[in-house]
Amino acid sequence: MAKAPMRVAVTGAAGQIGYALLFRIAAGEMLGKDQPVILQLLEIPDEKAQKALKGVMMEIEDCAFPLLAGMEAHADPMTAFKDVDVALLVGARPRGPGMERKDLLSANAQIFTAQGKALNAVASRNVKVLVVGNPANTNAYIAMKSAPDLPRENFTAMLRLDHNRALSQIAAKTGKPVSSIEKLFVWGNHSPTMYADYRYATIDGQSVKDMINDPVWNNDVFLPTVGKRGAAIIEARGLSSAASAANAAIDHVRDWVLGSNGKIVTMGIPSNGDYEIPQDVMFGFPVTTANGKYEVVKGFEVDAYSREKINITLKELEEERAGVQHLLG
């Protein structure tokens, strides 16, 4: 028997990431090749943006995706989020020239407060929310705090792009395929302060740390390369990383919904106090996923170097959180 369609909301649907994302969702890459989807697409109520969204929808129609059971354009989150099972919050105020992340906080706080309230009011009670729009961790925190009737664990932030970037750098360094790397993960904020940790990673049972055996490379090359990759792509391409961000969003939701098959992945989730991260901080953790739920992988020892790195990214997140607290009422 055919499965009932799942409703997927995507905000900023006519943007670069939306364009790289929607066709793949409609093709079944995120929720499974047997899972029909209804796309509920949100753009700002600006005539140009709504017109662009219509154009994207025309293209999606022209793909004749067998799994696409419906598609709607919206300008209001209260209608866009009606009964949604998955919400990808991609749209955010972009960073302009000379703007710091801090400048983005208040502009985005308004957007994500409104979207959190709308999800609280009209989404499925089991909605899975992934925030992609930056600053992703704090935007996810704002949305979560604005949706008191939804379980807090339903709100997540995207660290999977950092995770995937780290995987590809380790693969290049070791000359091994990406698929052979296990137990690599990322702590903290989706920002240059994130801490990609391969101390426990293995390739075919061998320790990656022992294979590389180069703390200077780790500190001076690997971590800055992963942390500043987004800026390097803007520098090279003149546009921000859209296709790789869309790909990471698909990976994140696919694993959350369908399970990671025992593999450790990275998700930004509200802390329960694990690894001494204060309650409710939206933080990248090593997790495994099964049956639509994620679980923090406990028991990794945090050495002095790692604790220092984790504290730096935690401090940044706590500063961001303090910067929006007054906006949350």
Swiss-Prot record:
Q: Where does NAD(+) bind?
A: G12, A13, A14, G15, Q16, I17, G18, N108, Q115, V132, G133, N134
- What InterPro entries does the annotation carry? L-lactate/malate_DH, Lactate/malate_DH_C, Lactate/malate_DH_N, Lactate_DH/Glyco_Ohase_4_C, Malate_DH_type2, NAD(P)-bd_dom_sf
Q: Any idea which residues are catalytic in this one?
A: H190 (proton acceptor)
Which GO annotations describe the biological process of this protein?
malate metabolic process; tricarboxylic acid cycle
Sorted alphabetically, the keyword list is: NAD, Oxidoreductase, Tricarboxylic acid cycle
Using the UniProt record, name the top-level EC class of this enzyme in a single word: oxidoreductase
Catalytic activities: (S)-malate + NAD(+) = oxaloacetate + NADH + H(+)
Q: What is its EC number?
A: 1.1.1.37
Q: What would be an example GO MF term here?
A: L-malate dehydrogenase (NAD+) activity
- Could you tell me the superkingdom of the organism this chain comes from? Bacteria
Q: Which family does it belong to?
A: Belongs to the LDH/MDH superfamily. MDH type 2 family.
What NCBIfam families is this protein classified in?
A: MalateDH-SF1, PRK05442.1
> What name is this protein filed under?
Malate dehydrogenase
What organism, scientifically named, is this protein from? Ralstonia nicotianae (strain ATCC BAA-1114 / GMI1000) (Ralstonia solanacearum)
